[in-house]
C-alpha cells in the first residue's frame, strides 16, 4: 500500500489540477463495510457535482466505496481502483456501475513469478531485490462488451498479455519440468 500511495503522490505532482477532498482507508475486520460507512459519510458532506471520482488503492476499499455509491444513489461519481477479483469484475459489469477502471496484475502470475524467484534464489542464481510487475488496465467498457461471463481466469482472452511473462524462467527449468512428467 505504501508504494501505491507514493505513486499516487507523484501523480498528484504531475497533475496539480487533481484535488483530493478526503483520504480514508484502514484495514479492519470488515474493510468493505467500514469503507462503505466512511464513504457514505463523505457523500453526505459533498453534494452532487462536488466529487468527480474515488480512487481505491486496494479492491477491498473499492468494493466498500462501490457499495456506498450505489446505496446513496451517487453513481455519477466514477470509481477507479487497483487490484481485481471475480467480485470486482461482476460489480464493474452491473448496469449503471460507477466502477470505471481497475488496474491489476494477474494474481496467478504473481505467484508463479514468486516461485520462479525462489527457485532461482535456492539455485544460487542472481535475483533482484525488488521486481515491478507490469499492470494492465481493465476498463469497464471492455468488460461490458463481453457476451459471456468474465472472471480473473478468463481475462487473458480479452486483455493482451494478461497472466504472461517469461521473467526469471531459467534455462534449467525445462529440465525440471521434463523430470516431473
Name what the model sees in each region.
Residues 1-181:
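A residue-level marker of the well-folded mature domains of exported/periplasmic proteins
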Amino acid at each position: 500500500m505504501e508504494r501505491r500511495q507514493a505513486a499516487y503522490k507523484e501523480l498528484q505532482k504531475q497533475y496539480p489540477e487533481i484535488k483530493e477532498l478526503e483520504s480514508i482507508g484502514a484495514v479492519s475486520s470488515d474493510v468493505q463495510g467500514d469503507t462503505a460507512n466512511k464513504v457514505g459519510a463523505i457523500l453526505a458532506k459533498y453534494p452532487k457535482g462536488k466529487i468527480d471520482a474515488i480512487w481505491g488503492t486496494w479492491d477491498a476499499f473499492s468494493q466498500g466505496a462501490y457499495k456506498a455509491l450505489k446505496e446513496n444513489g451517487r453513481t455519477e461519481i466514477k470509481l477507479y481502483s487497483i487490484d481485481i477479483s471475480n467480485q470486482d469484475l461482476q460489480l464493474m459489469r452491473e448496469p449503471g456501475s460507477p466502477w470505471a477502471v481497475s488496474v491489476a496484475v494477474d494474481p496467478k502470475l504473481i505467484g508463479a513469478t514468486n516461485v520462479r524467484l525462489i527457485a532461482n534464489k535456492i539455485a544460487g542464481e542472481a535475483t533482484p531485490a525488488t521486481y515491478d510487475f507490469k499492470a494492465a488496465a481493465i476498463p469497464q467498457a471492455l468488460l461490458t462488451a463481453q457476451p459471456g461471463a468474465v472472471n480473473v481466469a478468463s481475462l487473458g482472452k480479452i486483455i493482451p498479455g494478461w497472466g504472461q511473462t517469461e521473467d526469471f524462467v531459467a534455462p534449467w527449468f525445462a529440465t525440471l519440468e521434463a523430470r516431473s512428467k
